[in-house]
A protein has these predicted regions:
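Short alpha-helical segments enriched in small residues
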Residues: 2-183
Length: 183
């Protein structure tokens, strides 16, 4: 079982690196820029993106919006939406994309908000099941979203969210950018 998990992690990591390389190529060739807003993933997506040489030509930066204060006061998420739906909802990640694009002056943004788990006694997101993570990619009038709802433990939930976000971004760019020399 341990060897199987190691292989699975290796495959996931390699898959993410290859996708990041393709993202790099698409953004660089199309002279587009990217920013990130990460809550539960805490910078993992930015780390994957910046691990590719040349990412400084298109990646402007990222915001770790772990607290609702950062979501509302810096990235402009409507506090009423968080109060009504929690920070783990589609509307919040869409607003994070818009706020990130405005703040960082980017063409595209990736945003993630979720509850990776496990639940604790002082947890304010307990209304949301562990493993519930929303991802959004896009620009103000063209945002795609993805909801993850599988709890495999905190570490795997975060790794899965990072991988899914990278692939959602790659699919989005492939549909909207001029083709590059990618697989």
């Amino acid at each position: 079982m341990h060897l199987e998990l190691e292989f699975s992690n290796y495959y996931m990591e390699l898959n993410v690196k290859l996708a990041s390389r393709d993202i790099n190529e698409l953004l660089w060739r199309n002279k587009k820029t990217l920013g990130t807003a990460e809550s539960c993933t805490g910078g993992r997506i930015a780390s994957v993106i910046t691990a590719i040489p040349g990412s400084s030509s298109y990646y402007k930066g990222g915001i770790i919006c772990y607290s609702n204060f950062v979501k509302t006061e810096i990235l402009g998420v409507d506090a009423a939406v968080i109060a009504e739906q929690t920070a783990v909802c589609e509307d919040v990640v869409k607003q994070l994309v818009i706020g990130t694009n405005k703040l960082l002056h980017t063409d595209y943004a990736v945003a993630v908000s979720g509850f990776a788990g496990p639940a604790t006694s002082n947890d304010t997101t307990s209304a949301v099941p562990a493993g519930t993570i929303w991802i959004a990619v896009g620009q103000e009038n063209d945002i795609v979203t993805l909801k993850l709802e599988e709890d495999n433990g905190r570490d795997l939930n975060l790794a899965n969210a990072t991988e899914k976000a990278i692939h959602l971004l790659l699919d989005y760019l492939r549909e909207r950018c001029e083709p590059a020399t990618v697989r």
